């Protein structure tokens, strides 16, 4: 939509977004891209046609949560909404609808933010002045829709699985002409006998003109994940709101639409106030018979079934020819904001009682904003040798006050909320101006819990254990907070060989008392640090060498015994006239006849033995 010289707002409808700094690159009207491989397609579709968005089921495992600092309200576990809560304690539920609005730059309400709990990396929050905010959704209240697209919880509805999952799609930009009709057709993949509820909502763009008009743009989160989405200028979003046009409910009984009796409930008075006819609604279809400028904007279709399936589609309706008449402006790429943190560490450390060693988190960072506040915190929970494995629910670090994190099953074998863990050490860098090397030029204040008896090194990223007792065995979790928000999480299991426990990281929230425990097998095998114990390393080398020597000795003895058996058989059991030996003919008994020197010499010369009538001579024929 041309240059971005002021903040913009975007409707996020993509799946599987990795957290990080929000950037809008090449913000010009571009062709619609397929989310999975970003193949380009036609920008516009013909007027008076029926449009069917492309949907794709392969997406990443992540979920978005909208939340704000409005008044606290009771949380309904059966509702597809999440009620805003302050102190960053909004949490994710298995809801099946999704809608939100991006606002980069000047905020509508600095308390309302968009964040992603299911990734270990940065949350989407850029501070009070440059935060990512949301506006009220659907019926104008402060409830914010969410979606859970964890592939382990849903199957593929298009393949007929019993546990379908929400489906991705590509955005559709529809060009219409004044006084002409247009039809929007959403993708419908239904299962026989399931009751479906469809909702059409509408964000008008009547007050949005020029560069403030909604447009499909290329959006990047961090430097690795980019996608197409609808972007609306912040000034436009302040002057308009989203309306829920209608809701339709029916039970799918067959392939023919005529067999599906449905009920349409018009929940918006927008078009009545404008003295215009509301759009006609059918299952998966929205029709406008005569297009006026009041019908232009963003249409969002959501469908959820009684079996837990959920899907959606987004349409951007604009005047035909707008992109040709709009003055082209050069693309502007905003400077990156926030920070990026990456860590490398071992997930386990085996020690012997009395050892002295260091537990290091190798932290690599790239900070784009200054001044900033940085908190490095070490947390600890003891391990139970009967737990195989220990489970770390990283989502609870982003939502420490969520009920699922504070009250869950099998608490002795899990790490959830930081409120339930012990704080070992922390280092704080406040109002730091040096983004390149904060450890050298910024004042860091460290605090150690004396009960652990550990030493903090390397600016707060390394714990030193001295004369380590068995009681310090446990799961140590390292958390990086940037400007008050969780940016990175890492963990290490410290234990002896006798009480070693594996640990894995889980996505999502832990099961509560009313939910069955997870049945999936661990996907990750925790590596053991090969250099953690000299005694263990020496024993491994010695055992391996002894095994090799023993194997060689066994092979040698087997080969030798086999050769001896074969040789003895050939000498003792060789048949007559073999190639190597043959039996001599019998001669007269020398004791019964007169002996002569000549006969004795002959017998001694040929190596024979005499003493009977069956005198036998063995002669080597090869000589």
Curated annotation (Swiss-Prot):
Glycans are attached at residues 266, 437. The modification Phosphoserine is found at residues 593, 595. The chain crosses the membrane at residues 539-559. The modification Phosphothreonine is found at residues 596, 598. Residues 1-30 form the signal peptide. Keywords: Disulfide bond, Glycoprotein, Host cell junction, Host cell membrane, Host endosome, Host Golgi apparatus, Host membrane, Host-virus interaction, Membrane, Phosphoprotein, Signal, Sulfation, Transmembrane, Transmembrane helix, Viral attachment to host cell, Viral attachment to host entry receptor, Viral envelope protein, Viral immunoevasion, Virion, Virus entry into host cell. Pfam families: Herpes_gE, Herpes_gE_N. Phosphorylated on serines within the acidic cluster. Phosphorylation determines whether endocytosed viral gE traffics to the trans-Golgi network or recycles to the cell membrane. Residues 24-71 are annotated as: Interaction with host receptor IDE. GO terms for biological process: entry receptor-mediated virion attachment to host cell; symbiont entry into host cell. The modification Sulfotyrosine is found at residues 438, 441. A motif (Internalization motif) lies at residues 582-585. Disulfide bonds join 387-413, 396-405, 432-442. Its main location: virion. GO terms for cellular component: host cell endosome membrane; host cell Golgi membrane; host cell junction; membrane; viral envelope; virion membrane. Interacts (via N-terminus) with host receptor IDE (via N-terminus). Interacts with gI; this interaction enhances the Fc receptor function of gE. The heterodimer gE/gI interacts with the Fc part of host IgG. Envelope glycoprotein that binds to the potential host cell entry receptor IDE. In epithelial cells, the heterodimer gE/gI is required for the cell-to-cell spread of the virus, by sorting nascent virions to cell junctions. Once the virus reaches the cell junctions, virus particles can spread to adjacent cells extremely rapidly through interactions with cellular receptors that accumulate at these junctions. Implicated in basolateral spread in polarized cells. In neuronal cells, gE/gI is essential for the anterograde spread of the infection throughout the host nervous system. This is Envelope glycoprotein E. It comes from Varicella-zoster virus (strain Dumas). The lineage of its organism: Viruses, Duplodnaviria, Heunggongvirae, Peploviricota, Herviviricetes.
């Amino acid at each position: 939509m041309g240059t971005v010289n002021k903040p913009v707002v975007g409707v996020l409808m993509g799946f599987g977004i990795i957290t990080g700094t929000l950037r809008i690159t090449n913000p010009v009207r571009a062709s619609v891209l397929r989310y999975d491989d970003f193949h380009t397609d036609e920008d516009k579709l013909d007027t008076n046609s029926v449009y069917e968005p492309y949907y794709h089921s392969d997406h990443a495992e992540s979920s978005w949560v909208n939340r704000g600092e409005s008044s606290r309200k009771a949380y309904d576990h059966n509702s597809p909404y999440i009620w805003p809560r302050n102190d960053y304690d909004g949490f994710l539920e298995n809801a099946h609808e999704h809608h939100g609005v991006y606002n980069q730059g000047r905020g509508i309400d600095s308390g309302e933010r968009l964040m992603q709990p299911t990734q270990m990396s940065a949350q989407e929050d850029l501070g009070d002045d440059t935060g990512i905010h949301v506006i009220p959704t659907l019926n104008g209240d402060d409830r914010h829709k969410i979606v859970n697209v964890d592939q382990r919880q849903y199957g593929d509805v298009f393949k007929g699985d019993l546990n379908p999952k929400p489906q991705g799609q590509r955005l559709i930009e529809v060009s219409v002409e004044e006084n002409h009709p247009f039809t929007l057709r959403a993708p419908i993949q239904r299962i026989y006998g399931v009751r479906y509820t469809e909702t059409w909502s509408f964000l008008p763009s009547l007050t949005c003109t020029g560069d403030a008009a909604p447009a499909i743009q290329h959006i990047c989160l961090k430097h690795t994940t980019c996608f197409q989405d609808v972007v609306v200028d912040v000034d436009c979003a302040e002057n308009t709101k989203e309306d829920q046009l209608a809701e339709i409910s029916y039970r799918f009984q067959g392939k023919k639409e005529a067999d599906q009796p449905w009920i349409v409930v018009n929940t918006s008075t927008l078009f009545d106030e404008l003295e215009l006819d509301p759009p006609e609604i059918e299952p998966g279809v929205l029709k406008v018979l005569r297009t006026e400028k009041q019908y232009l904007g963003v249409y969002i279709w959501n469908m959820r079934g009684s079996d837990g399936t959920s899907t959606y589609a987004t349409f951007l309706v604009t005047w035909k020819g707008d992109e040709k008449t709009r003055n082209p402006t050069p693309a502007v790429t905003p400077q990156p904001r926030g920070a990026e943190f990456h860590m490398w560490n071992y997930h386990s450390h085996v020690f012997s009682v009395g050892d002295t060693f260091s537990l290091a988190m190798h932290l690599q960072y790239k900070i784009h904003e200054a001044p900033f506040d940085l908190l490095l915190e070490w947390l600890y929970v003891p391990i139970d040798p009967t737990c195989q494995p220990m489970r770390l629910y990283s989502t609870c670090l982003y939502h420490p006050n969520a009920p699922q994190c504070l009250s869950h099953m099998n608490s002795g074998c899990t790490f959830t909320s930081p409120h339930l863990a012990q704080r070992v050490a922390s280092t704080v860098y406040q109002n730091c101006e040096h983004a390149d090397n904060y450890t050298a030029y910024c004042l860091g204040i460290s605090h150690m819990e004396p009960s652990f008896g550990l030493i903090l090194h390397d600016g707060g990223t390394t714990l030193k254990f001295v004369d380590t007792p068995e009681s310090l065995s446990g799961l140590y979790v390292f958390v990086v907070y940037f400007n008050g928000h969780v940016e990175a999480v890492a963990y290490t299991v410290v234990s002896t060989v006798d009480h070693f426990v594996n640990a894995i990281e889980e996505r999502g929230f832990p099961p509560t008392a009313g939910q069955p425990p997870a049945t999936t097998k661990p996907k990750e095998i925790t590596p053991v640090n090969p250099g953690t114990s000299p005694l263990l390393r020496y024993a491994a080398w010695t055992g391996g060498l002894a095994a090799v020597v023993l194997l060689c000795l066994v092979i040698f003895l087997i080969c030798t015994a086999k050769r001896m058996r074969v040789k003895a058989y050939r000498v003792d059991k060789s048949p007559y006239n073999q190639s190597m030996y043959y039996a001599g003919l019998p001669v007269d008994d020398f004791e019964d006849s007169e002996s002569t020197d000549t006969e004795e010499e002959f017998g001694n010369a040929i190596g024979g033995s005499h003493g009977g009538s069956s005198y036998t001579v063995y002669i080597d024929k090869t000589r």
